[in-house]
């Protein structure tokens, strides 16, 4: 068992609970308790809590909005640190967000300020501090396009560091922070947005353009872009609603596979074999000769339709990419469904899907 740290004077103002349930802190509403749960509301409290855990050798779990976590039914034997810092700084087109800021609220404030660049990321659950870790993206925008710097606590050097965009190693749903999750604790994120006289950034995503009645590349009023994306997300159960079990999820559970040229050729052969010579899977250039295809398409064509499942964990009735808790599920129920989907897609198309949420105390 990990050592239970003795509370230090630096943590006297933080909220501290023992044997605290973690399920209410996740959008899945799943997972067992933590040995200790600390809620930090300032950067100093975050750093002090991290240092205390590290100095005592206590396992540490960082929790922001809880929208990207799958916590095991046995919980977490260590300190769970809930980052609840707040702060929205605006200087011209520059925006600085504290890690604990609710992301979708921050997007709304930038739209109200007339700034373009993250309006199509409206409705994504979670906190601002998670966005650079995952390189959050949707509907044609990624935060890597607008982040200028990430301020983080470096657990290796015990210093607060400022990491410029070029050193964040951003790629599809990935970054240096995700690659080395035990090293950095994101404290603040800085963005450079665009003042386009009340207009959005050029609309890149075809579905968004169709919904707006414009061509890809056009600009539209900022508020219209945000509201349209919120509508699209709501229709897929991707905007949190406690009354809608389709939103008791982590959003997209699997990342879209990126295939090499050889893998893509083998995939297309499997598609033709299974679906016929005229079948054409989704394909998007991913750089370096690679191709990205759709995880949702793979899941659907493997026989897992919307609403699939008979137990308390099922595929969303609105979107095949979301696995959901129908109210009485356990984490093991969810993982059993995820494993079934992964195995089915692998058998059908030879592609192994990779989970997007972080797993804690369990493996897929």
UniProtKB/Swiss-Prot annotation:
EC class: oxidoreductase
InterPro entries, alphabetized: FAD-bd_PCMH, FAD-bd_PCMH-like_sf, FAD-bd_PCMH_sub1, FAD-bd_PCMH_sub2, MurB, MurB_C, MurB_C_sf, Oxid_FAD_bind_N
Cofactor(s) the record lists: FAD
Keywords: Cell cycle, Cell division, Cell shape, Cell wall biogenesis/degradation, Cytoplasm, FAD, Flavoprotein, NADP, Oxidoreductase, Peptidoglycan synthesis
GO MF term set: FAD binding; UDP-N-acetylmuramate dehydrogenase activity
GO cellular component: cytosol
Pfam families hit by this protein: FAD_binding_4 (PF01565), MurB_C (PF02873)
Catalytic residues of the enzyme: 173, 252 (proton donor), 356
FAD-binding PCMH-type domain span: 30-196
Catalytic activity: UDP-N-acetyl-alpha-D-muramate + NADP(+) = UDP-N-acetyl-3-O-(1-carboxyvinyl)-alpha-D-glucosamine + NADPH + H(+)
Role noted for this protein: Cell wall formation.
Name of this protein: UDP-N-acetylenolpyruvoylglucosamine reductase
Organism in which the protein naturally occurs: Streptomyces avermitilis (strain ATCC 31267 / DSM 46492 / JCM 5070 / NBRC 14893 / NCIMB 12804 / NRRL 8165 / MA-4680)
């Amino acid at each position: 068992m990990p050592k239970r740290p003795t509370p230090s004077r630096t943590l006297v103002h933080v909220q501290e609970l023992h044997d605290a349930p973690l399920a209410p802190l996740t959008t899945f509403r799943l997972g067992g308790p933590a040995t200790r749960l600390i809620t930090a509301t300032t950067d100093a409290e975050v750093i002090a809590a991290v240092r205390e855990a590290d100095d005592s050798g206590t396992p540490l779990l960082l929790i922001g909005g809880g929208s990207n976590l799958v916590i095991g039914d046995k919980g977490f034997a260590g300190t769970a640190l809930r980052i609840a810092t707040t702060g929205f700084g605006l200087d011209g087109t520059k925006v600085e967000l504290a890690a604990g800021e609710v992301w979708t609220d921050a997007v709304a404030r930038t739209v109200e300020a007339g700034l373009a660049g993250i309006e199509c990321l409206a409705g994504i659950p979670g906190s601002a501090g998670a966005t650079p870790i995952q390189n959050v993206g949707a509907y044609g925008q990624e935060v890597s396009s607008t982040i200028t710097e990430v301020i983080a606590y470096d657990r290796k050097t015990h210093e607060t560091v400022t990491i410029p965009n070029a050193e964040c190693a951003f790629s599809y749903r990935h970054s240096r922070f995700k690659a080395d999750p035990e090293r950095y604790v994101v404290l603040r994120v800085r963005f450079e947005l665009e003042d386009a006289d009340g207009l959005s950034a050029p609309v890149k995503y075809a579905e968004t353009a169709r919904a707006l009645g414009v061509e890809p590349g056009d600009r539209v009023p900022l508020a219209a872009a945000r509201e349209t994306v919120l509508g699209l997300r709501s229709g897929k159960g991707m905007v949190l609603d406690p009354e809608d079990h389709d939103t008791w999820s982590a959003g997209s559970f699997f990342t879209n596979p990126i295939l090499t040229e050889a893998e893509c050729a083998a995939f297309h052969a499997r598609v033709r074999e299974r679906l016929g010579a005229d079948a054409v899977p989704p394909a998007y250039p991913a750089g370096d000769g690679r191709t990205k295809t759709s995880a949702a398409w793979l899941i659907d064509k493997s026989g897992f339709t919307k609403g699939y499942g008979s137990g308390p964990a099922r595929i969303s009735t609105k979107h095949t990419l979301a696995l959901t808790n129908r109210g009485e599920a356990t984490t093991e129920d969810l993982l059993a469904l995820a494993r079934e989907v992964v195995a089915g897609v692998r058998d059908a198309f030879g592609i192994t899907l990779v989970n997007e949420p972080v797993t804690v105390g369990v493996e897929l």
